[in-house]
Amino acid sequence: MTNSPYRHVSDNKLPTEDEQLLESPPPQRPEQIFLKSDSWRVLRIMGEFVWGFDNLADVSDGVTIFGSARTQSIDPHYVKAVQTAMLLAQAGIPVITGGGPGIMEAANRGAKEGGGLSIGCNIELPFEQGSNPYLSRSLNFKFFFVRKTMFVKYATAFIVFPGGYGTLDELFEALTLIQTGKVKHFPVILFGSAYWAGLVEWLTRTVAEERKINPTDLLLFRVTDDPAEAARIVMEARAEKPEDPVARMTAEHLRSAR
């Protein structure tokens, strides 16, 4: 464990907000209990939800783009993420990312260069993850689950580029929300067929064949290598969605007030 890159129980760095929430509280004196209690922390969580909702209230029908923070600008997937986000922005679609480097930067760059709304929802981490320079709106969250709510609430499609644990977490949470009927079916697009081939094969040959999911659950996502096709899938889904005139007018009013 001494050579592990991950945080050890003896790590004396200040804990993150998520860590404090998930830890069992130590014994405390009565006068300390409330201000350091989980009940008090719930108020902070509520405040972060309200703050996030307020800052994104004018955003509707966006697209959240996920992918690795480690992707370099010379990587073909970085270039494709720029192109994809630019097409979305030129169609008037807000682009939302985690606000960091790599694929997130590429998507925000494409959105900004396409003249669209480029949103970054960053997160407090034990190590620094600075915001990328292509954001027209930057939000910094302390709690992962609040941030993830924003990704879903203000988007009507997910485009998932190659990534690691964080990307997979966001992908499978979206698929679970759709599968369980917690949200209506929205496009989940896996970008990069070669990268995702192993995962798709495992879901098909192992998970579905062993009846851990239904065969129809494999229809919850699409795979592409083409920015134009990804944008087309998003726009076709938007065209099928019934318009909410009240929501549209409210969003337009909020945008004009900013």
Where are these regions (language model features)?
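Solvent-exposed alpha-helices and their adjacent loops that cap or buttress functional pockets
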Residues: 56-58, 87-89, 111-112, 129-133, ...
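Structural motif
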Residues: 61-64, 94, 116-120, 136-138, ...
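Active-site/ligand-binding-proximal alpha/beta "capping" segment
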Residues: 142-194, 238-243
